[in-house]
Amino acid sequence: MGATGFVASVMTAPFESMLHAASEIVEAAHDLEEDGPRGARCLGVHFEGPFLNNKFRRVHRNEWIIPASAARAKEMIDACKGGCLMVTMAPEVDGAADAMRVFLEHGVVCSAGHTSARYREGMLAIGLGFRSLTHAFNGMPPLDHRDPSILAAFIQDRRTMVQLISDGYHVSPVMVDILYRTLGDRIVLATDNMPAADPGYHIEGGVMRSADGTIAGSALRIDQAVRNYMSYAEISFAQAIVGATHAPARLIGADSEMGRIAPGTRADLSFWDEDYRIMGTMVAGTIVHGFHARTTTLAS
């Protein structure tokens, strides 16, 4: 609740199914855009997989994880018809460097995730062009003080941004606080939501779990993520909201047109009350949620 735009994630599946899903998402987003604002806009596609490390695949099925290649990267880009914004992959897997070059040539953000990489491999990945880390602490080795993981590399290099699931389950509130004190506005709040009716998954203890009890994603809304962030890191609303607005816009290279209130930017706004609850949302100057939705439009 409160979102005016989102990036749709395509999870690891048979490769052709992933391409088809991405194509369908982009086409649906285009059709909705032509009809005028009716809700949050789909900004593009994020592929989470299939170029992942089996050791840290979590709920991504082993048989669908495949080697990376330049050719496969190009197929993913082509399927999105210009709408591929980001891909999460393990930088250490075979073919990752070749795939990454293709993604970067087409302006796709490369995010490291579901990876076994340690600090040195992480620094090499950043040197090659990785600029984001998918869900800090999850799907990667722990942040060991003697043998630091890839997370240490992304914390240290100020060119990067780190995605965080602030639901209190994926990452301890204490670690959320520590990460904020270290990274500040380089944190991007991510919901990591799973489809509510996806077969084989259920909500238990506030998170989405697979049949064997493995955490498979969150049941988190972005407004709750902001409230949690404020509480865990003991920060103001003005500080916390950056993680859900300007930081993600900056990550996908769209901060000149969204993610902040300024002349020339899109009138995509969410309205919050004094208890930090969502009262309504506006997309492209039109109220689409709350306040008698679709009855009010800003004058041009």
PLM region descriptions:
Residues K74, D78-A197:
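Active-site core of metal-dependent hydrolases
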Residues M1-E24, G39-N53, C80-E92, V108-S111, ...:
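Divalent metal-dependent hydrolysis catalytic cores, especially in the metallo-beta-lactamase
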Residues T12, L19, I66-A70, A90-V93, ...:
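Electropositive phosphate-/nucleotide-binding environments in soluble metabolic enzymes
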